[in-house]
Amino acid sequence: MSGGLDILSLKEDDITKMLVATTHLGSENVNFQMEQYVFKRRADGVNIINLGKTWEKLVLAARAIVAIENASDVFVISSRPIGQRAVLKFAKYTDTTPIAGRFTPGAFTNQIQPAFREPRLLVVTDPNTDHQPIMEASYVNIPVIAFTNTDSPLRYIDIAIPCNNKSPHSIGLMWWLLAREVLRLRGTISRTTEWPVVVDLFFYRDPEEAEKEEAAAAKELLPPPKIEEAVDHPVEETTNWADEVAAETVGGVEDWNEDTVKTSWGSDGQF
């Protein structure tokens, strides 16, 4: 929580980013435990999330993450593809442990399997899709931080950060803001300077679109084809070969009519 400190309060630039990323847009349904985070309901049925409370809970979550002595004991999880890139980037900059993709059942409870882990804190992208690690964390008393929408269940969740967790841009921005706040509380970066890591790195990218963009970028880097100038070669004058070479006679006979034609194969003219 900001505790009324101006240095921890929500800045106008961050509010603009949230509005552009549609972080304030919830779903049409509301869980009774999420009603406290709903600002109002639009005419089309979409619930608007109070961004002031979103920021307060995000600061509280960052303080909980910083309180863990060993950063690798904090596990960040995302089963949905739109949050996997953000989870990997968050783990890269905060030295936490990512689990992107399918979660192995029993990783927190079954001690005999090779994938067994003992985290001290979980941060999940969506309580609906990440219900398996949340359930296992409740068995072994692991606190859970979750990005929750207006219709998300809050069972076994200790810190809920209300936001739009269905939009790729919104979930990427929330992970970026959480990573920046963690680094600020650790003293790694200053609050007076801008974090050089752009938020675009946390956004989900479609593999097909990424391949097209990379191919287009590689095509632009290729040097332009060299165009060779045409060289004028002297053209030799053609000569009439018929004038220089006389026509050869066949069989030494100039006139075919003068050649004697045999009428029989015998010497006496008989066949």
From Swiss-Prot:
Record keyword Iron-sulfur present: no
Keywords of this entry: Cytoplasm, Developmental protein, Nucleus, Ribonucleoprotein, Ribosomal protein
Listed Polar residues bias regions: 262-271
Location in or out of the cell: Cytoplasm; Nucleus
Single Gene Ontology BP annotation: ribosomal small subunit assembly
Record-linked Pfam families: 40S_SA_C (PF16122), Ribosomal_S2 (PF00318)
Region annotation (Disordered) ranges: 249-271
PROSITE patterns for this protein: RIBOSOMAL_S2_1, RIBOSOMAL_S2_2
The keyword NAD appears for this protein: no
One Gene Ontology molecular-function label: structural constituent of ribosome
Sequence similarity: Belongs to the universal ribosomal protein uS2 family.
Function field: Required for the assembly and/or stability of the 40S ribosomal subunit. Required for the processing of the 20S rRNA-precursor to mature 18S rRNA in a late step of the maturation of 40S ribosomal subunits. Required during oogenesis and imaginal development.
Subunit and partners: Component of the small ribosomal subunit. Mature ribosomes consist of a small (40S) and a large (60S) subunit. The 40S subunit contains about 33 different proteins and 1 molecule of RNA (18S). The 60S subunit contains about 49 different proteins and 3 molecules of RNA (28S, 5.8S and 5S). Interacts with oho23B/rpS21.
Protein name: Small ribosomal subunit protein uS2
Organism: Drosophila mojavensis (Fruit fly)
